[in-house]
Swiss-Prot record:
GO cellular component, one term: cytosol
Protein name per the record: Leucine--tRNA ligase
Molecular function terms, GO-annotated: aminoacyl-tRNA deacylase activity; ATP binding; leucine-tRNA ligase activity
PROSITE patterns given in the database record: AA_TRNA_LIGASE_I (PS00178)
Species annotation: Anaplasma marginale (strain St. Maries)
Source organism superkingdom: Bacteria
Length: 829
């Protein structure tokens, strides 16, 4: 089919080029680079965030291939999850069927963008041949003591009707549903991520290719603190152990606070108090809530003073942190201050700031440095010295021990849902919890389930959960909880390493860690932390030799758009807002925010691709903004990208003399100037690619194309134009691969452009400095000329005659005077 002579028809170009690409990767021999974007949940439609993520990864993969690397660049589907169950309820379709339809739809959409995936490595976590391996891992974890079951207080999402891990609760609400989280006590399965707390912290120091903000977020989430446990005698006779990182503030203590689940509360039997405690449990750990509490009527005895400290149950004290009990020092801790003010408790100041430091203890706690007073043996000491002195004193009394505490808790992996991986154990009245025999894996989900009764369909399935105990053969029941879906995403990067799926130790140890991992920063303390833990757990079980899954992490920014509302305050889609504006209707334009379905500030990728083509969308997504920063969607910007591609196409359409062959060993001085500029841009662009400054690379190849436009206009040597065009097409191919491939074919390029070597900048052209020469006729300036500083004088004179030809006309030249680096003066008769 003839493509040229009728304008840029991106639909025909992209369809043809996509049919010709083949990025299958047979076997693992020679693979020396692994590029991976965080795999998507198959919702049915890709969004602009997907396009940005996967285009960044594609540029890196294509660039690495151009340097001769054999790149593993796979794709898969994070396919378990609640939306599939919700679809089953809403539309009466089985979650497996719904998920497969969505995968098929999104597969077509991703292929339409031109991502160079190894589709032969595609996987879906809902397939038995995937999750049978993680069921086996779980059995390994049980054997190694890394998995256990216990009754504990959990975060219950009343909308999704399931338990959430601490990491999945954001500001007291479910990370997906947004529902207010409730506290319930249930038997749950846990993984002992806390066993690796120090290893996870130490490993952060080795991750030089990770953003500092992500490492800091993980460090804070793990939350290693050095403190002490103090023993307080109490009025009920039970010792109260209190954890504190600030024992030096003990002289300022005016109360003790315990979590609403603390064992000491068994000594309080008042029904009204119990009702208040239930209310405290509901909002425990919610920093947005007022500091609420209930007076137990119990007292603790201050270990150093004749002071009784009332004991309160408080919502800001968590049972999972430390001992679940603290002493309150309102003068020097803001949470204690707020609680003391709310409950009319005493405030004792013990640290006094230096002269000139402004503070108001009536309004807030003072947490700065200063000198101790009202503190007996600490009086006159500074804060650091006082801490050591207090610990030594308490240790000598025998009521104190030093401890290391972590904010990190074991990972609760039980979910009360159907559409997840079954946990491979059974419950037997005689034998207790019994692991399923490995030869019986996978434990598959039943296909016929009833979603109409609410709750977990596996709980009330008539046959699936009823089995024989593998140990004693008596009647038993399967575990009906399924794995948290983060279980699947914590090891999928290892599954891609093997053509057969699962984990092949030899393949994984060869290909891991992933060289470039691309995804959103919102996964810093969920997926990224769990994946690091999983590597360590699998190493302990003998499956892997590596501890860190990702060598370089690129956290792409969000795609943002203005938020629109109508006069009634209802959200509007951008296209509806523009129509209303054209019709003269009132539209409120709000701030620019992350694209969100709930606020309707979304742009449908399929609509934009249909209108402008994949290369236009790719180019816009990668222009102007660094990958790690948010990008604001702009219709004007998309139009600009489209116009650039049209102009590029016309250049080749109108100049059939452009070819892929060239010899620029001996070119004119002025032409050499252009070629030098191209090679200098190539050097800078290659450096940008190495450091993932993709927006800078785009700017340089656009500057390079402007130089080519100028060359054609000015009649530069065809050999120089050809070399420049070959460089231009090769460096733009990772970004806009469809049009680059077609233009490469247009100039007679050999083979597929995506298989061509990345060009190297010529050193002889990089070191050449340019100078501007004034061209005069009879002493009067008529033009200027850019030449290499080392250019031969005769060559410069010849070029000067060309640029002065119009001024000279028919005049006869008598002499030409050349002052190197400055001027050429042409004298006529």
């Amino acid at each position: 089919m003839e493509f040229f002579g009728m304008g840029y028809n991106f639909k025909l170009v992209e369809q043809e080029i996509q049919k010709r690409w083949d990025f299958k990767i047979a076997g693992n021999d020679g693979i020396n680079c692994y590029v991976l974007g965080m795999f998507p949940y198959p919702s049915g439609n890709i969004h602009m965030g997907h396009i940005r993520n996967y285009t960044i990864g594609d540029v890196i993969a294509r660039y690495k291939r151009a340097h001769g690397l054999k790149v593993l660049h796979p794709i898969g589907w994070d396919a378990f999850g609640l939306p599939a169950e919700n679809a089953a309820l809403s539309y009466g379709v089985n979650p497996a069927v719904w998920t497969e339809r969505n995968i098929e739809s999104m597969r077509k959409q991703l292929k339409s963008i031109g991502i160079s995936y190894n589709w032969d490595r595609e996987l879906a976590t809902c397939k038995e041949d995937y999750y049978k391996h993680e069921q086996a891992f779980f059995l390994d974890f049980l054997q190694q003591g890394l998995a256990y079951r216990k009754e504990s207080w959990v975060n219950w999402d009343p909308v999704d009707n399931t338990v959430l891990a601490n990491e999945q609760v954001v500001d007291g609400r479910g990370w997906r549903s947004g529902a207010k989280i409730e506290r319930r006590k249930l038997s749950q399965w846990f993984l002992k991520i806390t066993d690796f707390a120090d290893s996870l912290l130490d490993g952060l120091k080795t991750l030089d290719g990770w953003p500092e903000k992500v490492k800091l977020m993980q460090e804070r989430w793990i939350g290693k603190t050095e403190g002490v446990i103090l023993e307080f005698a109490t009025s009920c006779g039970q010792k109260l152990e209190v954890f504190s990182t600030m024992p030096h503030m003990l002289f300022g203590a005016s109360f003790c606070a315990v979590s609403a689940e603390h064992p000491i509360l068994r000594h309080v039997t008042d029904e009204a108090f119990s009702a208040r405690v239930r209310g405290i449990i509901e909002c425990s750990g919610d920093e947005e809530k007022q500091k609420i509490g209930a007076d137990t009527g119990l007292f603790a005895t201050h270990p150093l003073l004749d002071r009784k400290l009332p004991i309160y149950a408080a919502n800001y004290v968590l049972s999972e942190y430390g001992t679940g009990a603290v002493f309150g020092c309102p003068a020097h801790d803001q949470r204690d201050f707020e609680f003391a003010v709310a409950h009319g408790l005493d405030i004792y100041q013990v640290v006094f700031p230096d002269d000139g430091v402004q503070y108001d203890l009536q309004k807030e706690a003072y947490s700065g440095d200063g000198t101790y007073r009202n503190s007996e043996f600490l009086n006159g000491l500074r804060v650091d010295a006082a801490r050591n002195a207090m610990i030594q004193k308490l240790e000598s009394m025998g009521g104190c021990r030093r401890v290391t505490n972590y904010r990190l808790h074991d990972w609760g992996i039980s979910r009360q849902r159907y559409w997840g991986c079954p946990i491979p154990v059974v419950h037997c009245e005689k034998c207790g919890i019994v692991p399923v025999d490995r030869q019986d894996l996978p434990i598959s989900l039943p296909e016929e389930v009833d979603f109409s009764r609410g709750g977990n369909p596996l709980d009330h399935h008539p046959t699936w959960k009823h089995v024989q105990c593998p140990k004693c053969q008596s009647s038993a029941q399967r575990e009906t909880d399924t794995f948290d879906t983060f279980f699947e995403s914590s090891w999928y990067f290892a599954a891609f390493c093997s053509e057969q799926g699962g984990i092949n130790a030899a393949d994984c140890n060869k290909l891991l860690p992933v060289d470039y991992y691309i995804g959103g920063v919102e996964h810093a303390v969920l997926h990224l932390l769990y994946a690091r833990f999983f590597c360590r757990a699998l190493k302990k079980c003998g499956h892997l030799a590596v501890e860190e899954p990702f060598r370089n992490l690129i956290t792409q920014g969000m795609v943002c758009h203005s938020v629109y509302r109508d006069a009634a305050g209802n959200y509007l889609f951008p296209e509806d807002a523009q129509r209303m504006i054209r019709d003269g209707e009132a539209v409120q334009r709000g701030k620019v925010e992350k694209m969100s379905k709930s606020k309707k500030n979304v742009v449908d990728p399929s609509h934009i691709i249909k209108k402008y083509g994949a290369d236009t969308v790719r180019l816009f997504m990668l222009s102007d903004t660094p990958p790690e920063r948010d990008i604001e969607w702009s219709d004007v910007g998309v139009e600009g990208a489209w116009r650039y591609l049209e102009r590029l196409w016309r250049l080749f359409e109108d100049n059939s003399s452009i070819g892929a062959d060239f010899d620029t060993a001996d070119v004119k001085a002025e032409d050499r100037v252009y070629l030098s500029g191209i090679h200098k841009l190539l050097r800078g662009l290659s450096a940008d690619m190495e450091h993932c400054r993709l927006n800078c690379a785009v700017a340089k190849f656009r500057e390079m194309s402007n130089t080519v436009f100028e060359m054609v206009k000015c009649g530069v040597s065809q050999q120089v134009i050809n070399e420049s065009v070959c460089i231009l097409l090769r460096v733009m191919e990772p970004f806009i691969p469809h049009i680059a491939e077609k233009l490469w074919e247009r100039i007679g390029g050999e083979g597929m452009l995506c298989n061509r070597q990345w060009p190297s900048a010529r050193e002889d052209l990089l070191t050449e400095d340019l100078v501007t020469i004034a061209v005069q006729v009879n002493g009067k300036l008529c033009s200027t000329l850019k030449v290499g500083a080392q250019c031969d004088g005769e060559e410069v004179k010849a070029e000067a005659l060309k640029v002065a030809q119009r001024k000279l006309g028919d005049k006869e030249v008598r002499n030409i005077y050349f002052v190197p680096g400055r001027v050429v003066n042409i004298v006529t008769k």
